[in-house]
Design a protein with these regions (language model features):
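A short beta-loop-alpha structural element at the N-terminal edge
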Residues: 1-17
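Conserved acyl-CoA
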Residues: 91, 102-119, 142
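Conserved beta-strand in the GNAT
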Residues: 61-70, 84, 89
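A short helix-loop-beta-strand connector motif used in the catalytic cores of GNAT acetyltransferases and
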Residues: 44-55, 84
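Conserved beta-strand-loop-alpha-helix junction that forms the acyl-donor binding cleft
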Residues: 95, 106, 117-132, 149-150
Length: 150
């Protein structure tokens, strides 16, 4: 398996397709999310900004991807740089085989290169997605906020 950092339009299209799959899955857990969203150029447009990390894993073909960005730099409000994990998706056949962990490790390594130890990664996980919640907890992430909706 190989991690490829997104650099061109072709890479971005692969990630757009993964994001559509993730959105479709999350729509089954959260009624606010529309199921048939078509993603176009989200990753391509994101690459224009500094401090964005987009990568995917291949095993002869793409099997998973990750998308994160610097939301709040250290300074005025935060004591550390806040990186938001926007999306993590692994094809079902490859889940529980270390692919997600590999992608998260690649994100953390990128963050260390950019910010040394002066960062946190924030993740929003849908409550009904217990597998994802357990996965992040297993990697050492802890609950710090709860979003309430009416």
């Amino acid at each position: 398996m190989e991690i490829i950092r997104v650099q061109n339009d072709s890479d971005c299209q692969i990630c757009d397709e993964f994001l559509e799959k993730l959105i479709k899955f999350e729509a089954g857990c959260d009624s606010l999310i529309l199921e048939n969203v078509k993603v176009k150029d989200i990753h391509k447009n994101s690459l224009k900004h500094d401090n964005v990390y987009i990568a995917y894993v291949t095993d002869k073909s793409p099997i998973g991807y990750i998308f994160a960005y610097l939301k709040n730099p250290k300074g005025k409000i935060n004591s550390k740089n806040v990186i938001v994990l926007e999306a993590l998706f692994v094809e079902e056949h490859y889940r529980r085989k270390g692919v997600g962990k590999m992608l998260m490790k690649s994100l953390e390594n990128w963050a260390k290169e950019c910010f040394e130890k002066d960062f946190v990664v924030e993740i929003t996980s849908i409550n009904k997605n217990e597998n994802a919640f357990g996965f992040y907890k297993h990697l050492g992430y802890n609950e710090v906020k709860t979003i309430l909706r009416k």
